[in-house]
Amino acid sequence: MNIIDSFEQKNIAKLTANKNIPDFEAGDTVKVTVKIIDRSIEKDGKEKLTERFQAYEGVVIAKRNRGITSSFLVRKISHGEGVERRFMTYSPIVHSIDVVKYGVVRRAKLYYLRNRSGKSARIKERHIPIAKNQAVKA
């Protein structure tokens, strides 16, 4: 491991210390919570910063693993239009990543979903068995 790799590993460890980044891949439906900082100017001229969180849920169509510059592309349909947004995996703006559904696909990049709509754009769901310690007792 060279100096650059060790530097990246230290920074990744620092950025993920208070975050849990799950294992996900292309085809999975994720919910990404993003921190948004709004800036407004009050009547007396002072600047006011407000912080809020916004959720973005969609299908991961591409994932790029490149150390600290890793990113993933999420696609969703909003008001009948396809919207894609790229998130940096280790960015401080990304508050949390939750996997909603696991999908079954045979490709690493799902760019073909851009040309499809309706039933042909659906992805089969992969069922993950619940671990024994997480099982709900009835």
Curated annotation (Swiss-Prot):
InterPro entries: Ribosomal_bL19, Ribosomal_bL19_CS, Ribosomal_bL19_sf, Translation_prot_SH3-like_sf. Keywords: Ribonucleoprotein, Ribosomal protein. It comes from the Bacteria. The keyword Ribonucleoprotein applies. GO terms for cellular component: cytosolic large ribosomal subunit. GO terms for molecular function: structural constituent of ribosome. GO terms for biological process: translation. HAMAP family: Ribosomal_bL19. This is Large ribosomal subunit protein bL19. It comes from Rickettsia canadensis (strain McKiel).
